[in-house]
Amino acid sequence: MKVTKKVLDQSLCCTALLALVGGAAAQCALPSSYSWTSTGALAEPKAGWAALKDFTNVVFNGQHIVYGSVADTSGNYGSMNFGPFSDWSEMASASQNAMSQGTVAPTLFYFAPKDVWILAYQWGPTSFSYKTSSDPTDANGWSAAQPLFSGTISDSDTGVIDQTVIGDDTDMYLFFAGDNGKIYRASMPIDNFPGDFGTQSEIILSDTKENLFEAVQVYTVDGQNKYLMIVEAMGANGRYFRSFTADSLDGEWTVQAGTESQPFAGKANSGATWTNDISHGDLVRNNPDQTMTVDPCNLQLLYQGRDPNASGDYNLLPWKPGVLTLQV
């Protein structure tokens, strides 16, 4: 599919028109079912890399800042960011900058109370770790690693995997997966962050391994007093996302779009022709801060996809970035 700004900005256009009616900003509820349009693959891995994956994205000073994991041609993992760009159509020409130290499966956000940027990740010195910076565009300008979570889980081949961090007015929350059909949560007072969530966590969702696999993300839904969780699942037709909602970050989560035939995002509703898989990514947020706020009038999902005909070692599969835009 040819990438055009017109296609990518269609929801923003509609939102702007609605906002003009009555002179107030439009507010939208989350849809009861989802239908998307998709770009094609937006970037190719640079020489020596086989895959670009596990994306986290913020918009800062009008530009996208994207971090992700890479797999090299031997299947070894590393980390990278893209040089800042204003429009998704510019991602292909943005620089791909290797990080000197791995921050695999990252989460990037600005922690407003302390005026500091946070990059949380796995496979560091502790179960989950984080680094800080004053400049999120500099791939190698991050601090030394600090402990984010030091606990372990049982009944998991991978151990803790794929964290995300989000805050409300009083607390910060850590959510993560285990490739084992469970989603976990830990919390701390917001005044103690950045810091270590400790060793304890609780299981908040439990299902089959296939239904709750990995890549959990949690967001504040703008204007709705609601939170949205998406979790990657394994289906007959590839990876897809299921969604859940809650009234509070410490509350109960209720499935919203939970089947492969009617997912949050997957082959059944993505509109993508270049990939069957809609895998590990990040919704585009309203602002870069710890609230992880998304606009339900203008949902876009940065995801990883791959050629359906590619096979072999998972770590060598040719994952690339694409973007879904919700049809409204």
Curated annotation (Swiss-Prot):
Q: Which GO terms describe its biological process?
A: L-arabinose metabolic process; xylan catabolic process
Official protein name in the record: Alpha-L-arabinofuranosidase axhA
Give the EC number. Answer: 3.2.1.55
Could you name the domain of life of the organism this protein comes from?
Eukaryota
Query: Where does the UniProt annotation place the signal sequence?
Result: 1-26
Give the organism the record lists.
Answer: Aspergillus sojae
InterPro entries, from UniProt? GH62_arabinosidase, Glyco_hydro_beta-prop_sf
Q: What UniProt keywords are attached to this protein's entry?
A: Carbohydrate metabolism, Glycoprotein, Glycosidase, Hydrolase, Polysaccharide degradation, Secreted, Signal, Xylan degradation
Q: Please state what class of enzyme this protein is.
A: hydrolase
Give an example GO cellular component term for this record.
extracellular region
Similarity section: Belongs to the glycosyl hydrolase 62 family.
Where is it mostly found? secreted
